[in-house]
């Protein structure tokens, strides 16, 4: 903003001044060249989309308030596109009726709108943004996987040409996009808003929200009986550990959420030294959740929630970090009291365990099994997904195979945020005076200054040099 690159017009919405627009145009051209090189065909799809299109896929209801919904003057439900899977299927549904036309890929560089609750970080987390989104269509999963690998390599070339060879790909969660496999392209930087787990032993990389959390527990030699002890003012794991002289890994803590669909409570129990992954929880439940506002009517005793004697009418889940443990400390569901000696199977009956925890720093790598995980901050600059038949099946896209049978094609999708990419280049390529743009995307190649503009000879020489540079195709700021 201070450098004259952009100006805010509303929360999370910016106008671009000429220097930034020149940068983003060059980034867009690099992206176009690499998408064309892998057989992409550029199209343009509307920003405003009918709600009925999103109803076909089921996302009109399943996606939360980040999707901006409104009605036109006739009362027809409409949305502002935050992603274009539905529009892409609608665009090629008739074209893709015969197997001979596969595989193919379409892409666009288009404005999108996502109604972020907390826009932040300049162009990193905005509400209106420009994105390259591409969609590929295939007759087999094997063909999709081959093209997915080609697109992965194309992304590596894009980021290298843009001046960000440091970008790495990490395994990620598919989230609302659906599908079986996805990767995020991350710039590792302390300014990042995402957490990335990297194994120092085998090189495994993943977003901590998606990485499998492996916990190894040694069962105690002797099980203690379940006992209730008074723990005044021990509302947190830290306070509880200090009061009872235990470590967080010896605690069974409760994290409470509410389902966005009906507001019902979800109580997740996990080991006290771990954090819950809201992404994993959402995927398991099949609906969005939010941290709960615990009210007296809920029957929950905040700070003292435990699995023994917990009130009914809510979903209760257990993380795999508790499997095989014993002699745990947990809430007693009474204000100011905890229980010691908890062994879940003995005290709660049959328990099902699932992975709901974030992979922690120093944790065990899910690939090589070594405790060599290091967690770093990162900014996501791109993503790729193998969507399978999630959208084509729901929206009735079919093709006729060589044997005359109708089949459903599978899809991949591939996104890059153009403004976010520019912001990331600026984040790592700057000095005390401002951005140091790589030549390939710099707004101008030469900054020509006439230091004695009041001298006719100097001014004439500067003008002549400016004209000569322009004639030879050099971009000059004068």
Please state what every model-predicted region is:
Residues 1-478:
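NTP/phosphate- and nucleic-acid-binding module
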């Amino acid at each position: 903003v201070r450098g004259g690159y952009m100006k805010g017009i509303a929360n999370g919405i910016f106008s671009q001044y000429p220097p930034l627009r020149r940068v983003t145009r060059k980034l867009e051209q690099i992206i176009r060249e690499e998408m064309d090189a892998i057989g992409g065909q550029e199209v343009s799809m509307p920003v405003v989309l009918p709600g009925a299109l999103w109803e076909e896929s089921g996302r009109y209801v399943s996606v939360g308030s980040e999707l901006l919904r409104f009605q036109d003057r006739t009362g027809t439900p409409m949305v502002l596109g935050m992603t274009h899977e539905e529009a892409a299927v609608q665009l090629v549904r008739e074209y893709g009726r015969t197997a001979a036309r596969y595989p193919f890929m379409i892409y666009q560089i288009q404005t999108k709108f996502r109604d972020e609750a907390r826009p932040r970080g300049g162009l990193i987390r905005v509400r209106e943004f420009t994105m390259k989104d591409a969609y590929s269509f295939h007759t087999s999963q094997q063909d999709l996987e081959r093209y997915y690998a080609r697109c992965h390599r194309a992304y590596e070339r894009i980021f290298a040409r843009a001046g960000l060879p440091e970008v790495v790909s990490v395994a990620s969660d598919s989230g609302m996009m659906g599908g079986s496999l996805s990767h995020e392209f991350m710039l590792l930087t302390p300014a990042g808003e995402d957490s990335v787990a990297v194994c120092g032993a085998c090189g495994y990389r993943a977003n901590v929200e998606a990485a499998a959390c492996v916990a190894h527990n040694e069962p105690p030699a002797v099980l203690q009986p379940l006992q209730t002890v008074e723990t005044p003012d021990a509302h947190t794991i830290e306070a509880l550990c200090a009061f009872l002289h235990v470590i967080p890994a010896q605690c069974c803590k409760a994290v409470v959420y509410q389902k966005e669909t009906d507001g019902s409570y979800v109580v997740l129990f996990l080991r006290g030294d771990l954090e819950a992954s809201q992404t994993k929880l959402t995927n398991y439940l099949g609906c969005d959740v939010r941290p709960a506002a615990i009210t007296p009517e809920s029957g929950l005793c905040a700070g003292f929630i435990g699995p023994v004697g917990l009130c009914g009418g809510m979903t209760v889940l257990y993380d795999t970090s508790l499997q095989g443990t014993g002699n745990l400390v947990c809430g007693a569901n009474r204000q100011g009291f905890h229980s010691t000696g908890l062994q879940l199977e003995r005290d709660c009956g049959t328990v099902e365990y699932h992975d709901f925890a974030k992979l922690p720093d120093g944790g065990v790598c899910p690939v090589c099994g070594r405790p060599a995980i290091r967690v770093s901050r990162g900014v996501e600059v791109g993503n790729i997904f193998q969507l399978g038949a999630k959208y084509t099946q729901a929206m009735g896209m079919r093709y006729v195979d060589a044997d005359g049978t109708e089949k459903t094609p599978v899809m991949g999708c591939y996104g890059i945020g153009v403004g976010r990419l520019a912001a990331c280049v600026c984040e790592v390529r700057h000095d005390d005076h401002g951005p140091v743009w790589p030549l390939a995307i710099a707004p101008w190649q030469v900054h020509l200054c006439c230091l004695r503009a009041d001298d006719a000879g100097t001014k004439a020489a500067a003008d002549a040099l400016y004209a000569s540079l322009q004639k030879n195709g050099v971009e000059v700021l004068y």
